[in-house]
């Protein structure tokens, strides 16, 4: 409730996209942190992620988000894996996402999800979560209404599935 939170999901390209968004926010003069497989930042420079886990366990994520808020961040960008979004593990269950970014989905992690449909459904939980809160937050001590929206790779065959998974506006992109 103290950060505008952007989640990024997809089979490939999550870490790069998280890094790009984080760097873009910083170039725009916004203080931001991020969590990805490779690195993380709680408001300062990026450091190596010692766990090398795409979406860490919920207590680790909450610790980083708390540190970001304490360090004066306005934004958090989180790499969100299908495992982390799955209701089985519920690693992201307590996060109020304001923006969801969908990169792509291909056949992967079927041993965990059991089917492609379940894999895609778990990834789309990011977009469903956009509808779960009112996006009223207190950022840097100020009450703000954070715009909520999705961003979808229109070249992916599952784009329409992700668009239909939220009531929020969705922007599309192509490469």
Annotate each predicted stretch with a short phrase.
Residues 38-48, 98-107:
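Gly-rich Lys/Arg/Thr-decorated short loops/hinges at beta-loop-alpha junctions or inter-strand turns
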Residues 70-71, 87, 96-175:
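Acidic, Mg2+-coordinating active-site environments of NTP-dependent enzymes
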Residues 83-93:
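Switch II of P-loop NTPase G domains
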């Amino acid at each position: 409730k103290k950060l505008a939170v952007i989640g990024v999901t997809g089979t490939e390209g999550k870490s790069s996209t998280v890094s790009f968004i984080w760097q873009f926010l910083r170039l725009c003069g916004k203080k931001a942190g991020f969590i990805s497989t490779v690195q993380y930042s709680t408001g300062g420079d990026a450091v190596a992620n010692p766990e090398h886990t795409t979406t860490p366990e919920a207590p680790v994520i909450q610790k980083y988000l708390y540190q970001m808020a304490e360090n004066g961040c306005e934004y958090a960008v989180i790499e969100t894996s299908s495992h982390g979004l799955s209701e089985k593990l519920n690693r992201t269950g307590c996060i109020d996402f304001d923006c969801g970014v969908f990169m792509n989905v291909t056949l992967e992690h079927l041993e965990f999800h059991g089917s492609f449909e379940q894999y895609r459904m778990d990834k789309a939980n990011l977009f469903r979560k956009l509808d779960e809160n009112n996006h009223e937050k207190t950022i840097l001590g100020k009450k703000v209404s954070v715009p909520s929206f999705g961003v979808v790779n229109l070249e992916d065959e599952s784009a329409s599935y992700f668009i239909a998974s939220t009531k929020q506006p969705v922007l599309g992109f192509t490469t």
